[in-house]
C-alpha cells in the first residue's frame, strides 16, 4: 500500500523491500539503477550504437520502451490471443536514430521479446528486477506530465481542466505497483475511480460474479491508496464513505470530484522521485561508477550529482529552442511538472518558463516526421543547487492543510508560500452540502476558507550547494510572495493521447 500508515520510504516501495535501514535502502536503490545502466550498455552494444548515439535521449526512450513491452505480461498474453495484422506478438522494437554522413537517419529495429528479457535479467543478476522496470515507467510518466496537458481526460471524467496540478502520474500503467501508487496525484486516483464507477453504472455485471469480486477488491484498494494521500480527517472520512458504498454510483462520483477540488487547497501527499533516462545510468556505469557500493537515493543529492556530470543529447526539430527542450527534460528528470516555477528556477539557476511560452514539442519524434531537417543539441540538465524531494504536499502545520494554488504540487522541500486564488477555487463549492457526507463537506469547506495564501510551507527548509552532500547548510530562498508560479498558465501544449 502507498498509504502513509505503512512507513516504508519510497525507495523501499521502489525496490520491493521490507523495512531496511538507510544504508540498505541506498544499496538496493543503487543496485536497481546500476542494473538499468548495465542493461543500457548491453543494448547499445547489441544495436552497435556509437557513443554519441547512445547518449541520444530518443534512443534511450526506445530502448526503455522495448524492455517495458517485453515484460508486459498482460499485453503479451492479449496479443497472442488476439493476433492483429502486422503485429508479431513475440517481437518488440522502435525507432533507433543513427548519425550518417552528417545527417540523422531513423531505422526501425525489431527484437525478440525473449532476447530482451534475457539481456535485462543478465544485467540484473538473473532476476526480473521489477523495481527497475517501475523506475523506467515513472521516468516516462514524469516526462508525460511535463510535456502534455490532460484537459480532455479531466473534462471527460467531469473534472475541471484547471485541476491539472493534481494529475501527476496519470499515464502510469496499472502494473506500476506501490512505487507507482506513491507518485500518483489525487486527481489521477480520482479519475481512475470515476472511470471504474462509470463502467459499473453502464455495465450491470461489472460488480457481479467472480470477476466482480476481484473488481470490488481493486476498487477498495484504490480507495485506500487515495485515502492515504489525504491529510485531514474529514477528507479521509469521506473516502471511507466512498469505499464502503454498496453500489457505487453518481453520489460517489460527486464526492470524489468534491475531494479532488478540495485537494487544490488541502493538498494530498504525493511522492516525488528523480527518475532519469536509462542512458544516464548507462554513462555512469560505463565510466566505472559502482552504484550498489556507493549507494543511491532518488530523493536526495544523487540524481543532481549524476546530471551534473552527464552529457545527453536530443534531436531538435527545425523551429524548436534547445534551451526550452532542456527545460522540459530537466523538469521531467526531477518530477517537477507541478512545482512552483519560482522554486524550480531558483534550484536550476536559470529561469524556468511556463509551458505556454516554450518553443518545443515533446521529446519523442513521430514516425512520419521528416528526418532530413533534424538537428541535435546537448541538453542542459545541470542545476545551481539541489533540494530534497518531498512527499508531503506542503501543508503548513497549523492546519495540517494550507494554501494551494490552482497548479502547484510541491516537488522540493523548500520554504515558500503557496499562492492560490481562493475565489476561483471556492466558487466551485457553492451549493450541495446535503446528503450522507454533509458534515464532512462542511468541515472541509471550513478548513479551506481558513487557509491563507501567504502562509509559509516547509518552514526553514532550503536548498543546498552541490558541494554540500550531507545537507548541512540550508540556503532559504526568499520569493516574491505575490508572484504566481504555475507551469500550466496560458497553456497550449498538445493533449496526451495513447
Curated annotation (Swiss-Prot):
Q: Pfam families of this UniProt entry?
A: Flu_NP (PF00506)
Any one GO BP annotation for this protein: viral penetration into host nucleus
PTM comment:
Late in virus-infected cells, may be cleaved from a 56-kDa protein to a 53-kDa protein by a cellular caspase. This cleavage might be a marker for the onset of apoptosis in infected cells or have a specific function in virus host interaction.
Q: Where in the cell is it found?
A: Virion; Host nucleus
- Motif extent (Bipartite nuclear localization signal): 198-216
SUPFAM superfamilies in the cross-refs = flu NP-like
Main subcellular localisation: virion
List the signal peptide residues: none
Record-level Gene Ontology MF annotations: RNA binding; structural molecule activity
Keywords tagged on the record: Capsid protein, Helical capsid protein, Host nucleus, Host-virus interaction, Ribonucleoprotein, RNA-binding, Viral nucleoprotein, Viral penetration into host nucleus, Virion, Virus entry into host cell
Q: What does the entry list under GO cellular component? A: helical viral capsid; host cell; host cell nucleus; ribonucleoprotein complex; viral nucleocapsid
Disordered as annotated region, ranges: 1-21
Motif location (Unconventional nuclear localization signal)?
A: 1-18
Answer whether the UniProt record assigns the keyword RNA-binding to this protein.
yes
What is the annotated quaternary arrangement, including any partners? Homomultimerizes to form the nucleocapsid. May bind host exportin-1/XPO1. Binds to viral genomic RNA. Protein-RNA contacts are mediated by a combination of electrostatic interactions between positively charged residues and the phosphate backbone and planar interactions between aromatic side chains and bases.
| Assigned protein family | Belongs to the influenza viruses nucleoprotein family.
Biological function: Encapsidates the negative strand viral RNA, protecting it from nucleases. The encapsidated genomic RNA is termed the ribonucleoprotein (RNP) and serves as template for transcription and replication. The RNP needs to be localized in the host nucleus to start an infectious cycle, but is too large to diffuse through the nuclear pore complex. NP comprises at least 2 nuclear localization signals that are responsible for the active RNP import into the nucleus through cellular importin alpha/beta pathway.
Q: What is this protein called?
A: Nucleoprotein
This chain's source organism reads Influenza A virus (strain A/Turkey/Ontario/6118/1968 H8N4)
